[in-house]
Amino acid sequence: MRNIMIIGTGGIGSYLVDFLSRIGIYDITVFDDDKLEEKNLTYQNYIPDTVGQTKVSAVNERLKVNGLKLVDEQPYLVLVEKQLKGYDLVICCADNLAVRRMLYRQGYGDDAKLKWLDLRAQGRNAALISYKVNENLVDDLLAGSEGSFSCQGGDWDGSPEQVNCMQIAVAGVASQWIQRWFIDNENVADKMVLNV
C-alpha cells in the first residue's frame, strides 16, 4: 500500500479523500480538527447526517455509505514536523499558511526531507504545487495573510448561485498527479495553475 497523509478535509480534502479511496490502493490518514457545519455542505463533499461531527469522522461516514475504504481519522491540528514523518506523500489541503510553511521547510527536489504536495483553491483559481517546485518561487507562494480562508473566495455571498467548484477541479488534478507520481515520480509537473 501507498501511505498518504492528507492535512485538511474541507473543500479540497473532502473530494481528494473520496477520489483516492475509490482507487483503493492507498492507506490514507487524515488530519483535521474542524467540525462539519451546515454551511460546509454547499461546497464540501459531506452528507447532511454528519453535521456536527468532526470532519475526519464525517469523511468516514460518507465513505462507508459508498462502500469505500475507510481512512485513519486524526481529529487534530498538525503542529510539529514530527507529525509529518512516516508517509510516502504528505498532502496539504489546509486553509492556512502556517501548515504550508512547515511543509515547505521540508525542502525541494531531490533534497526534500519528505515528498509533499500543496493544493489550493480560492474563488475561480486553484493550484497544485509540489516539492519539485523551483525554490526561487517560494516567497511568492507563501505570501499572504495569516489565518484561514475559504476556498470559495472572499466575495462568496453564501448563495448556491455563487458557489465556485475549483476545489473539486484541483482535487481531481491532484488525484491524477498522485497516481502518476507513484508510477514514475520523474514524470509529473512541479506545479499547475487552474483558472476559469
Model-derived features with residue positions:
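Glycine-rich adenosine-cofactor-binding loop
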Residues: R2-I25, T29-K35
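Alpha-helical elements of the RecA-like P-loop NTPase motor core of helicases
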Residues: S14, K39, R101
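Short, well-ordered alpha-helices that flank and scaffold nucleotide-derived cofactor binding pockets
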Residues: D18-R22, E61, R105, R180
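Glycine-rich phosphate-binding loop and adjoining beta1-alpha1-beta2 segment
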Residues: I25-L68
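Conserved beta-strand scaffold positions in the cores of enzyme catalytic domains, especially
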Residues: V30, D72-P75, W116, K191-V193
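A structured beta-alpha segment of the ubiquitous adenosine-cofactor-binding alpha/beta core
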Residues: T54-L89, A94-A98
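Glycine-rich phosphate/adenylate-binding loop
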Residues: L84-L89, C93-V196
